[in-house]
């Protein structure tokens, strides 16, 4: 069985911007048959296992003073241990790093992702890793800790992540080439976006011809 780790933030977890807030103090999650990870699992079949490790608010390597445990670099070693063996990995982080509180540049965010990538490379061959640059942020995200600079930085990540993928010989995919953020919050995938991202990820995974 080929085991693929999907490591990311709320767009890997499956945050639903439509139903969010319908029940006070809760986060609403798309069901498995809508999430791109769930669709990927169904498409790959019983001989594969998609290990969903998404967390709302997760960053590449920043500590969020308002939300504990969101540093992706710090969490990754334990997650890798808990999910062994891992044959392949998909990593999509960077959206939360664009928050105005961090004031990070695209290069700084990419440096954080590189540290995560190095951890993945300790257990997964580069040709079995898919690096995904996140969605472009939209103005609706201003109500959730983002600003004009955040939007600009989110649009630079595609270029810098592609350079990083080339540096380490991993596969690359830009989520922004296939989906747009919801108009409701400017940062999360819609149902249609999950389907579109799944189709792109599946194509990449199949072309990678992962061996276990």
What is the role of each PLM region?
Residues 16-20, 62-65, 141-145, 184-185:
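Short aromatic-enriched loop/helix-cap "lid" or pocket-rim segments at secondary-structure transitions
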Residues 29, 64-68, 102:
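Short secondary-structure transition/capping motifs
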Residues 1-55, 61-63, 78-81, 167, ...:
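Serine-esterase "nucleophile elbow" of acetyl-processing enzymes
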Residues 38, 46, 70-212:
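Alpha-helical cap/lid subdomain in secreted, periplasmic
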């Amino acid at each position: 069985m080929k085991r693929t780790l999907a490591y990311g933030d709320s767009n890997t977890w499956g945050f639903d911007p439509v139903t969010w807030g319908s029940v006070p103090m809760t986060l609403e999650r798309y069901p498995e048959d809508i999430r791109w990870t769930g669709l990927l699992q169904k498409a790959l079949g019983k001989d594969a296992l998609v290990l969903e490790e998404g967390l709302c608010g997760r960053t590449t390597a920043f500590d969020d003073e308002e939300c504990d445990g969101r540093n992706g670099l710090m969490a990754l070693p334990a997650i890798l241990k808990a999910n062994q063996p891992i044959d392949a990995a998909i990593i999509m982080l960077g959206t939360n790093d664009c928050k105005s509180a961090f004031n990070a540049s695209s290069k700084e965010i990419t440096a954080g992702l590189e540290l995560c990538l190095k951890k993945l490379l300790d257990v997964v061959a580069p040709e079995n890793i898919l690096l995904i640059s996140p969605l472009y942020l939209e103005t609706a995200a201003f109500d959730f800790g983002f600003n004009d600079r955040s939007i600009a930085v989110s649009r630079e990540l595609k270029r810098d992540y592609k350079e990083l993928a080339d540096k380490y010989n991993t596969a690359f995919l830009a989520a922004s080439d296939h989906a747009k953020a919801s108009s409701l919050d400017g940062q999360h995938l819609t149902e249609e976006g999950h389907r579109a991202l799944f189709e792109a990820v599946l194509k990449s995974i199949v072309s990678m011809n992962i061996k276990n």
